[in-house]
Amino acid sequence: MSRLTWAEAEVSPEVALALLESLRDADIPTEHLKDEDVQQSLPRRLGLSPVVEANIRRYAALSRDGGSLRAQEVGELFQLVSRRPDARSVFWDAGRRLAQQASKRRGGVRAIARGLPAGVRRRMGLRGVSRIARQLAPDGDVRTELRPTGLIMNGGLLAQACRSDAGCLLLNAALERSLELYRAEEGPISHVECEGRGDRNCTWRPATA
């Protein structure tokens, strides 16, 4: 995805909101260090800054009102987070957060899924995460596969914004959590192909596939 496409495309604010909430939670101090190294601690405190809090409120309002964000703004947020030493855990938490929110919107996930065949539960889990993936590929392609279970994305913001596979952990976690919520557990999910590593697509599959 080119810089021009990022500037023109619009995406849902939900991903940006989840990412900033995860960033904020990661930066809440668990203890006070008297001899704190400011240079070391400053990057970790970004999530507690007034700018981040203001953007959380803005993204939440946009989400409630059905608004959108420029894809460029979301891509720049991914770039910012990817430079943190704890980037992988922040992306992972955001992915789980998004899957949880998606399931709540559909209501009663666990109760509905309990009596359904495994294949139907798997399809429901994939449908939930594919919606998240499409928010991250406004000018790309997203598809899912049932046998073996898989999520394939081409031209998404994740790898292209981060220029690595760190941001792709967001969908890694979202897929894993979505399948758990629909009781279609496949175990750990692996990111077997990555555009950020030079592959043609980003592909996620169960580690045992």
Locate each region found by the language model.
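N-terminal accessory segment detector
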Residues: 1-148, 158-166, 198-199, 209
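Short, hydrophobic/π-rich interface segment
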Residues: 138-195
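Beta-rich nucleic-acid/ligand-interaction surfaces
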Residues: 188-208
